Amino acid sequence: MAGSTKDIDALIELMARLPGLGPRSARRAVLHLIRKRALLLTPLADLMGQVAATARECLNCGNVGTSDICDICTDERRATGELCVVEDVADLWAMERSGVFKGRYHVLGGTLSALDGVGPDELRIPRLADRVTAEAISEVILALNATIDGQTTAHYIADQLGGRVRLTSLAQGVPIGGELDYLDDGTISAAMRARKEL
């Protein structure tokens, strides 16, 4: 790029590695940050340094925060006996945004995958079993993605925890506002199997 420096090029390359950003979007973002240096770039750089120094994984559930035990795990009001199991932190944050779940979470850190060589010990499944006992959990809600690996993981967890705790999973099927014509066969099939009385 004409007139650029190595530092700016390096920043663009790093930004382009972020999910959802390619080289063009990264260039636009960096240019915008430079133009708004006092308003955006400097505070962003300061906060990124602070987060880099303080961010850590919750030792209990796997959420991301700035202390060893996250705010959700330390909130006594959330000790409802319900534990929502999710694949990753982004899923936990999505559940929190919805505001429908008021219990605690357990982040697996992925799903079982024979192709990728991911077994139970690479995930937080053993810790999940420990928490069910230690925290007197009455229900484990499996909020895993409706993929082959997600369902394989759900079945494995069900085998490991079966009989010790009530196990439920999120309903699957037609989304609100969804039209059957636009849905894939698997979604329609899941919706038919999960149908309920009116």
Swiss-Prot record:
Family: Belongs to the RecR family.
Zn finger spans (C4-type): 58-73
Protein name per Swiss-Prot or TrEMBL: Recombination protein RecR
Entries under CDD domains matching the protein: TOPRIM_recR
Keyword Zinc in annotation: yes
Entries under NCBIfam families matching the protein: recR
Keyword terms of this UniProt record: DNA damage, DNA recombination, DNA repair, Metal-binding, Zinc, Zinc-finger
Matching SMART domains: TOPRIM
InterPro entries registered for this protein in UniProt: DNA_Rcmb_RecR, Rcmb_RecR, Rcmb_RecR_Znf, TOPRIM_dom, TOPRIM_RecR
Keyword DNA damage in record: yes
